[in-house]
Amino acid sequence: MIIGIPKEIKNNENRVSLSPSGVHALVEQGHTVIVEKSAGLGSYFEDVDYTEAGASIVNEQAEVWNVDMVMKVKEPLEEEFQYFKEGLILFTYLHLANEEKLTRALLENKVVGIAYETVQLPDRTLPLLTPMSEVAGRMSAQIGAEFLQKYKGGMGILLGGVPGVSKGRVSIIGGGQAGTNAAKIALGLGADVTILDVNPKRLQELEDLFDGRVHTIMSNPLNIEQCVKDSDLVIGAVLIPGAKAPNLVTEDMVKEMRDGAVIVDIAIDQGGIFETTDRISTHDDPTYKKHGVVHYAVANMPGAVPRTSTIALNNATLPYAQQLASKGYLKALQDNHALSLGLNTINGELTNKGVAEALNLSYTDIESALK
């Protein structure tokens, strides 16, 4: 199979979908890998690193898309839609529930769209989303601490406090991978941390994991309202695989927060959980204020730490890429149920129910689509 690795064009997206070691593994299996010039530079991989691993370097974006399978990091932008073609395998983060134009373009061009974020193991874990959730979660606490500084627009609070001064209060909505990793860093910074989740069993697991050092509270509108009001930093870390993120924090709740408090919405790439994060920000211009509250709503947070993120992503995606390349997408999807759950579009049909509901489009179940 011929596999293309484009250079990411999203604002300050410095990750690349495969490291040279990943390329080498595919080439060793007999596949051809084409890498767009400078695709790895943001992650400190030189073109020569890829050629030594067995890849070919091309100058034109069109060349790297004229392949059997394209591996990316982030969803294609509109200027890349022109390269879609029937039967092209697109293996990347798609987040289609918040991307109607992209969804329609994939369907119209009969692209085989396989989303990293909806590949799901029998225990319901998301192996290709987990590494980036870990990165984004850890970053969220660091970013929140940064923007609480006065010169960054915050209220001038040190999360860890000092002797005689109260710690900063952090509320994390969602106790999954991102929320758990946010809590680890927030605790490390010395903050007073509360985690809200809808699953009592998960709350018990978090109590045990953190040895009682975090407050765990059932997530419901009343508890969310109270925690949001009392917090200096609120982190949104809720995920429903494939579906649009639920709107859990209303504008009225945000209005009750103190001036200079900070919101970090990790779920913004799926629409966000805050009513007031109504637009996506960028690494160039990461925050905006509403009702005196600093909002951080960057959809590609791990792109700011590309070396770590690229290697972690490569480690997770490579085994699945090898299956797709060696077996072809149809047999690979039929043989691997976890991978088949990543299938979002095929032959002009939408195969993710959460996306179909979010965009009010017709849905075809995966089993029928693969017959």
Swiss-Prot record:
Pathway: Amino-acid degradation; L-alanine degradation via dehydrogenase pathway; NH(3) and pyruvate from L-alanine: step 1/1. Gene3D superfamilies: NAD(P)-binding Rossmann-like Domain. GO terms for cellular component: cytosol; plasma membrane. Substrate binds at residues 15, 74. The active site is at 95 (proton donor/acceptor), 269 (proton donor/acceptor). It holds the Pfam family AlaDh_PNT_N. The keyword NAD applies. Its EC number is 1.4.1.1. NAD(+) binds at residues 133, 177-178, 197, 219, 238-239, 266-269, 279, 298-301. SUPFAM superfamilies: Formate/glycerate dehydrogenase catalytic domain-like, NAD(P)-binding Rossmann-fold domains. Keywords: NAD, Nucleotide-binding, Oxidoreductase. GO terms for molecular function: alanine dehydrogenase activity; nucleotide binding. GO terms for biological process: alanine catabolic process; L-alanine catabolic process. It is an enzyme of class 1 (oxidoreductase). It comes from the Bacteria. It catalyses: L-alanine + NAD(+) + H2O = pyruvate + NH4(+) + NADH + H(+). InterPro entries: Ala_DH (IPR008141), Ala_DH/PNT_CS2 (IPR008143), AlaDH/PNT_N (IPR007886), AlaDH/PNT_NAD(H)-bd (IPR007698), NAD(P)-bd_dom_sf (IPR036291). Homohexamer. Trimer of dimer. Belongs to the AlaDH/PNT family. Catalyzes the reversible reductive amination of pyruvate to L-alanine. May play a role in cell wall synthesis as L-alanine is an important constituent of the peptidoglycan layer. This is Alanine dehydrogenase. It comes from Staphylococcus saprophyticus subsp. saprophyticus (strain ATCC 15305 / DSM 20229 / NCIMB 8711 / NCTC 7292 / S-41).
